[in-house]
UniProtKB/Swiss-Prot annotation:
Name of the protein: DNA-directed RNA polymerase subunit beta''
One annotated GO biological process: DNA-templated transcription
EC number: 2.7.7.6
InterPro entries given in the database record: DNA-dir_RpoC2_beta_pp, RNA_pol_beta''_euk, RNA_pol_Rpb1_3_sf, RNA_pol_Rpb1_4, RNA_pol_Rpb1_5, Rpb1_funnel_sf
Originating organism: Oryza sativa subsp. indica (Rice)
Residues that hold Zn(2+) according to the record: C220, C296, C303, C306
Superkingdom assignment: Eukaryota
UniProt keyword Magnesium, yes or no: no
Amino acid sequence: MAERANLVFQNKEIDGTAMKRLISRLIDHFGMGYTSHILDQIKTLGFHQATTTSISLGIEDLLTIPSKGWLVQDAEQQSFLLEKHYYYGAVHAVEKLRQSVEIWYATSEYLKHEMNSNFRITDPSNPVYLMSFSGARGNASQVHQLVGMRGLMADPQGQMIDLPIQSNLREGLSLTEYIISCYGARKGVVDTAVRTADAGYLTRRLVEVVQHIIVRRRDCGTIQAISVSPQNGMTEKLFVQTLIGRVLANDIYIGSRCIATRNQDIGIGLVNRFITTFRAQPFRAQPIYIRTPFTCRSTSWICQLCYGRSSTHGDLVELGEAVGVIAGQSIGEPGTQLTLRTFHTGGVFTGGTADLVRSPSNGKIQFNGDLVHPTRTRHGQPAFLCYIDLHITIQSQDILHSVTIPSKSLILVQNDQYVESEQVIAEIRAGTSALHFKEKVQKHIYSESDGEMHWSTDVYHAPEYQYGNLRRLPKTSHLWILSVSMCRSSIASFSLHKDQDQMNTYSFSVDGRYIFGLSMADDEVRHRLLDTFGKKDREILDYSTPDRIMSNGHWNFVYPSILQNNFDLLAKKRRNRFAIPLQYHQEQEKEPISCFGISIEIPFMGVLRRNTIVAYFDDPRYKKDKKGSGIVKFRYRTLEDEYRTREKDSENEYGSPENEYRTREEECKTLEDEYRTREEEYETLEDEYGIPENEYETLEDEYGILEDEYRTREEESEDEYGSPENKYRPREDKYGTLEEDSEDEHGTLEEDSEEDSEDEYGNPEEDSVLKKGVLIEHRGTKEFSLKYQKEVDRFFFILQELHILPRSSSLKVLDNSIIGVDTQLTKNTRSRLGGLVRVKRKKSHTELKIFSGDIHFPEEADKILGGSLIPLEREKKDSKESKKRENWVYVQWKKILKSKEKYFVLVRPAVAYEMNEGRNLATLFPQDLLQEEGNLQLRLVNFISHENSKLTQRIYHTNSQFVRTCLVLNWEQEEKEEARASLVEIRANGLIRDFLRIGLIKSTISYTRKRYDSRSAGLILHNRLDRTNTNSFYSKAKIQSLSQHQEAIGTLLNRNKEYQSLMVLSASNCSRIGFFKNSKNPNGVKESNPRIPIPKFLGLFRNFSGLLGTIAPSISNFSSSYYLLTYNQILLKKHLLLDNLKQNFKVLQGLKHSLINENQRTSNFDSNIMLDPFQLNWHFLPHDSWEETSAKIHLGQFICENVCLFKSHIKKSGQIFIVNIDSFVIRAAKPYLATTGATVHGHYGEILYKGDRLVTFIYEKARSSDITQGLPKVEQIFEARSIDSLSPNLERRIEDWNERIPRILGGPWGFLIGAELTIAQSRISLVNKIQKVYRSQGVQIHNRHIEIIIRQVTSKVRVSEDGMSNVFSPGELIGLLRAERAGRALDESIYYRAILLGITRVSLNTQSFISEASFQETARVLAKAALRGRIDWLKGLKENVVLGGIIPVGTGFQKFVHRYPQDKNLYFEIQKKKLFASEMRDILFLHTELVSSDSDVTNNFYETSESPFTPFI
């Protein structure tokens, strides 16, 4: 009892770490046996107390935190503000994500701290609190999820879901929260299972590497050592851990007194003496040299002294102990305790959180504004960055506080601002070292609604790749998605309304009419426009759409949409010109289309050469209405044919020379040579555009002719416009070739195949077979010829279908079979025609043709002419009509496969088209204007636009035009080489006429000259400016104010979807904003209620200069508006006065120029430029006075929400698109902020759909060691995989080691020391890295275990090819010690380099093939060993276990070890060598110190990209 009274009574909590300390102290004092008795008593006591207490866990014990409500509310408030800023376009998506994660993370962490204090204060004996905080079960974060808040979760990809789970498990989760938490929960379950498996496999590999390492000797006699010194920044705790249990490599002196000798093991007493010495004399203290497994000289075992004390009983390790297996298990076992991966919060906290500086008191803050620069924080907040230390003063009422802000910090307040106490005034950046690695992360932003994409001038308009749609942002700017309602239609993309026009919503739903497309197939196709001014023709690459003609019932409109800078508008009064009015055709008054598609072509700069085709006219009679495919057949006649004897025998005629029947290609060439010099404008269309040969032909489809009205006309006037369908309706059952299913497009244009070519030109004249007797009769026909021109009198269209299929496709029809309409040919194709099938297999593809028609097997083959075109009996369709139409058939011979005698005749229906002499000019153009001057001549030329017997097959939904009529210009004056053309518009009293004016004199005045822009200026045309919008025209509806039932229409070709789209701007998408009444000149334009059409690309051309007044005529029937669009944003406006409310036309009163310059200042001309309608001239009045006003707003401007322009705030973000005197209308838009370097997807003006990718951000995320943590990190190091990128200075250092050390020392020394240095450095670095991971998880492992493993991993060198030695082959892996010994034994030096192998490779590169085979790849290893004749000396444990021998450890150890007599004398030899040894150590190995992880060498030594030691290999 007396003894017990003297003991200290300890009354405190005891947790896991305290228990560990207690046990270790007991062992030190009492030894193992006595300690076990004491621990038994503690165990009994614990169980007894637990039974008495009977702690149980109930749901009532889960106490929630009272402050949680307002903490969450506060976080929600911040999130709401953040969302608002994002909506305004003030922060971008990455900043929003970062800030959101940070807000909720901070809230969650704060709640965790609150939870601890809450338990401690309210209920310290709470079972939950007791269990988790004693470490018995669970931990704080798990309890936090039970009673605090679950917080942010990661999705399966490891990305943060920025919707936090606000509930805890006590309160219960909502459905959304439950689903989100399932992600994290599932991940946790999977992680646990994977972690267990991974840890087990790691242990197996580790044991495999070191299973043969056994303590076999007392002393290896090494003279190497590792120095340990607290001066290297090592903490005292780490210093003690490193030294205890080691063996000294040198005597240790204090002054002249030796306090410890070599080979003495270090206990706690000796360590304490070292520490007191260091404290007393920190600078004089010498480093302590110790022996470690790294220094042991043995190859495949280890000595007692290098290993040190055994951890189990505190004495030197015994001989025969399997320390390798112990080391492997010591490292592998805690693997299950390591987390597999940290909870990674979206890259926010990896760079270390910033320290905040708070204001010490209320007051006014002041600092030097010149020392700071405005910037954005990583959350998108405005801030100031100070580059040097900044002194801030805070002036409160009675005291002046001074705060110093370190450099590179962010100041979050403004100068002279009033701050409150504890307000955050600055943010100090976390210390970022040069070795802080970053990784680039991509984040995609998707569009939240349908809309049209716009951007500012800050986006490169040239895509990153020539035909791509990706653009880089050179600086931070906004992208806008203008809101639209999508009206989708498979055929509709044209409206009679102009872009930005308003209309009633029901206008096209009640009519039920189709709306057709007016934009070409693709805007981004290249014209090659030739410059005619230079000495050589320079090629200018510009984007342009072909000229086109619009028809709207009352007028034809010319839209030369070649870019503004490609032609001159002439302004000089000349008599040498004439004008062609493009006039409305009187006879067709009731129909909304013009009967002729006259397309005027004004070439580049308006220069016309001789024999230039100035206009095209496509006669609707020669149009193939339905979208079938087929063959055109015709023949040419020369004048001599007229006079040839008609009675000649037909056989002779068939044999007549071929050159009389020239092919269409030659004919076309003649036309080109005679009448055309500028081919590029028209000829290259087919190749480069991929659109039909005739871009003007498709009146129905492209220019808005309504299909139902066209069909009505078809039936009314079958004779004139009869389609193939109508012609064959009477013979439907006979030929079965109705074309109703042939509307879809077909494959490629392909010539008819060789098998029919013998009949193609066989019968150039028309013959008829009278049906009853199969007699052949020849009938001549009349020819129409111009003087020297070969003329076609009649041509035929024969239906045929061709499919080009891949070679591999499986056909569902047989060759020579007969099929019906809509038969399935392959998996995805169906036939449009019925008839005979012919299949031809070629090398690259399979051709499948379908010939329509009947099949006859004639009795006598010689009575049928192959390849004949035969008219059937004439039939009158209408008795009143005197005109007769003929139906023709085309007779073709066909052979039956593999039968030479058997023939059959294919009778195919053909559509005949007659050609007449050409139209009289008077029918096309009024005569009077043409007779103004006799010096210019026009003549008409017809040519066929399809080659003879080529298969005409359309890719697009277009109709084929067979014949084109061209208007060819010529003149008499020999000396004049060129004429000038321009467009003139005359308006007077409701009459509008548009003229093409051609004059022979070059004008002296023109608005603009063509500028040769640099490539960069030209590249602006890359961006898809939608000329559709500027070229469409107004409806006849009057302009009305916005109301509920009106919408504005804009048309656009949608490139990436199959169907075309209409943009409908409804009233819900626009908002009208009234000006403040007293504001001065609100819109900067003094006009009476102007209606200003907005150019889509206003605002794109700020950076380019150009001359004033380039006019792109957009001539329309209603608004009579011109666009003036140049590079410096000139907008031409005009006063529109209503002449008469009942009339649909507005009269041009006068034109007014307004110049909007780069700074959005508007300058108006006082004088008008008047158009004199009677003399067809422009008069320029002198303009002396200027009036300048500055506009607060301008058309096309984008305004963010909540911007204060006037007294009232703007309620919605958007683009200004109507400006009136007292108000303006905003089209709603959603801004997206995009930072520098972001990639924009899509084209300017392109329609995007909800969910389309909009922007890709690339942002840097600090990458520190938390990306892979725990077990994967340990495994990564052991397997020698790349961990981080190598720091640049370290890379240089390794290069130096490899190159210079061998060069300095030369010979064997160089390679020996180079490899030694490298290996020594890498070993220490690796040990530190692994320890860092384990210590971060609270796991204590002795260094020597890790050292044994690392020793094996780094013990190999690779023999290099530098020197040829007979011992090892180049590239062979050998142990470092073996290489050194071989080098000493040989006269010749061995060259080798250090290499690092992972544990798996080391396991397969041991001296024992049995051990390798038992690990992996058994068959390969054994086969290789047999071929090489390897010998296994059975030194390890595994080999003996496999073969059933005695393992060489413990008692079996004695049989394997023989005492060497020189062991006894070893110590004395070492003493003699000591002088040399210490010098060598000083030279080479002083830097191989055990330092803490602060040193950049040890931190980053190992961080190469592939294998860490590739520089040495």
